[in-house]
């Protein structure tokens, strides 16, 4: 009698399927992807030369000091206070660029790279847009630029266009640790903020 009751329950539960064909239910085992943050339009404040951005037009060079965790904005996940695309750095095409990344975040490793990806920062492949435009071990939480460390990168800008400066530590760009990085064909240079 107990066996008959148990068998009846099994048959009853099996009959209560969701009405989907078995084939569809079996093949649809992946969850829908989580939408990543969509970048805002480039910051449109006045173009300025800041104390951390220096240009030498005769030598066609730019030197920047970019500080990760300069402020506590975004839990220190920012570049000179910029995050979520609220800052645009513009550099002329063909200039030699030196960036000193200073990590002032008290607890977290960060990296810096110039990426051709300008939106949907779910998972950003740590591939630089220009040769040399990336810090070492960019996706490592233990070997990237650690708190209190400074790392220098040097590269020459390529084709004019829209790029981004991102932290390649997994999840950092998706959480907002990115700013716009433009390469200008007309020699325009400087920093714009919406902060």
Question: Which role fits each region the language model picked out?
Answer:
Residues 1-14:
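Sec-dependent bacterial lipoprotein signal peptides
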Residues 23-47:
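Post-signal peptide N-terminal segment of mature Sec-exported envelope proteins
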Residues 41-46, 51, 136-195:
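Extracellular/periplasmic metallocenter environments
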Residues 51-55, 85-113, 151-159, 163-165:
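Beta-strand cores of secreted/periplasmic/IMS beta-sandwich domains, seen most often
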Residues 59-96:
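N-terminal edge beta-strand
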Residues 76-78, 104-147, 173-176, 180:
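Histidine- and aromatic-enriched segments that form or immediately flank copper-ligand environments
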């Amino acid at each position: 009698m107990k066996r008959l009751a148990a068998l009846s329950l099994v048959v009853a539960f099996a009959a209560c399927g969701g009405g989907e064909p078995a084939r569809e239910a079996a093949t649809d085992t992946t969850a829908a992807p989580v939408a990543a943050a969509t970048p805002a339009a480039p910051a449109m404040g006045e173009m300025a030369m800041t104390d951390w951005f220096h240009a030498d037009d005769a030598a066609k060079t730019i030197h920047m000091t970019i500080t990760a965790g300069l402020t506590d904005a975004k839990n220190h996940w920012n570049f000179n206070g910029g995050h979520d695309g609220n800052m645009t750095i513009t550099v002329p095409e063909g200039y030699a660029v030196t960036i000193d990344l200073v990590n002032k975040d008290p607890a977290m490793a960060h990296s810096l790279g110039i990426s051709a990806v300008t939106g949907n920062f779910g998972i950003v492949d740590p591939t630089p847009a220009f040769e040399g435009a990336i810090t070492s071990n960019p996706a490592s939480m233990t070997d990237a630029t650690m708190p209190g460390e400074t790392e220098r990168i040097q590269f020459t800008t390529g084709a004019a266009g829209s790029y981004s400066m991102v932290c390649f530590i997994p999840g950092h760009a998706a959480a907002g640790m990115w700013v716009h990085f433009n390469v200008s064909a007309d020699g325009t240079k400087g920093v714009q903020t919406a902060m």
